[in-house]
Amino acid sequence: MSTEISAAAPRRAANGKKRANRRKKRRTQAESDSSDSSDSSESSQPSADEQEAKTDDVAVELSDVELSDSENKTVSHSEKLDDESKAKLKSIQLTATDLSSKFALQQNRNIDLQKAGREVDHGLEKLAKLDAQTSEQESGRLKTGYINMLFEHVGEDVNQLRNAPDFTPKSLVVLANALKDGGDMFDIESLRALVDNK
């Protein structure tokens, strides 16, 4: 009997494998048949897998919302530091390089825009004063050049006036100032053109 049992065991095992294969084939055929028939019904009703996937998506979205709320709580909580904590954080020495130290220097400079505006206005006033002084000096130079040009042309007439009996040294100054102020009838550009192009 033991030989029969030992010979029958491999047959049973082989038959068992065949049966398992048949069952798998049946399941596969049944699944494909049901999927063919369910294809037409799927358009009207979602399958259980799809419903399960949608449920998972909703669960994921709810957990995302919960995470977002918890993240917001931790962020808002961490923003509230007391003065002691701030002082300790400021006292921590960080690694410094040339680049980071230059960047830190630029960030530590608080620019007072009102002060900068006042300095700009003050600078503009200085420039206006210098420009006025320069234009006065330029105007004086041009007027003197205009007088010299006039004396070149009318110098003999002025000498004849100096020889007149009622002519005094004070009269010469008055005459020179009158001729000099006569340059005011020209604008600066015209006067410059006259004097520079003699």
Swiss-Prot record:
Belongs to the RSA3 family. It is found in: Nucleus, Nucleolus. Required for efficient biogenesis of the 60S ribosomal subunit. The gene is RSA3. Residues 14-27 have a biased composition (Basic residues). Residues 70-84 have a biased composition (Basic and acidic residues). Its main location: nucleus. InterPro entries: Ribosome_Assembly_3 (IPR051898), Rsa3_C (IPR028217). It comes from Eremothecium gossypii (strain ATCC 10895 / CBS 109.51 / FGSC 9923 / NRRL Y-1056). GO terms for cellular component: nucleolus; preribosome, large subunit precursor. Pfam families: Rsa3. Keywords: Nucleus, Ribonucleoprotein, Ribosome biogenesis. Residues 31-48 have a biased composition (Low complexity). This is Ribosome assembly protein 3. It comes from the Eukaryota. Residues 1-84 are annotated as: Disordered. Associates with nucleolar pre-ribosomal particles. GO terms for biological process: ribosomal large subunit assembly.
